[in-house]
Amino acid sequence: MKRTTIAVIGVGLIGGSIALSLKRDPDIRIVGFDVRQDFLDKALNTGAIHAGTTDLQTAVREANVIFLAAPVEQIYAILESLRNLDLQPGVIVTDAGSIKTGIVNHAIRVIPDHVTFIG
């Protein structure tokens, strides 16, 4: 059986907790992304993620699921970036943002057709 790859975008408290929980499943591979190398180092050292990167394309390239766990204002920019990246067909994108209407409306406008957004 092929492992499911989940990209956790933002490995701070929320993203790190999500990653730790998901990593309990041996069939899931967690790739963490953060702009802060110290957050990635902590996530790797605590075993929350299998791999970490500061390059968004590297984080999402093989992902079956992309979990956005960044501050709301950054989620908008990340959604914009995702539309220009090489994503797996059928990839699911979801978020932990506290403001749903704005994020969902923005995702509808910018997410490519081969991507499913669950807000």
What is each of the regions a protein language model found here?
Residues 9, 33, 69, 94-97:
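Structural motif
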Residues 39, 74, 100-103:
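Conserved short alpha-helix immediately C-terminal to the canonical SAM/SAH-binding motif I
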Residues 48-51, 69-70, 109-113:
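Short, hinge-like loop/turn segments at secondary-structure boundaries
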Residues 51, 77, 102:
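Short, conserved clusters of charged catalytic residues that mark active-site
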Residues 56-87, 91-92:
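Rossmann-like NAD(P)-binding element
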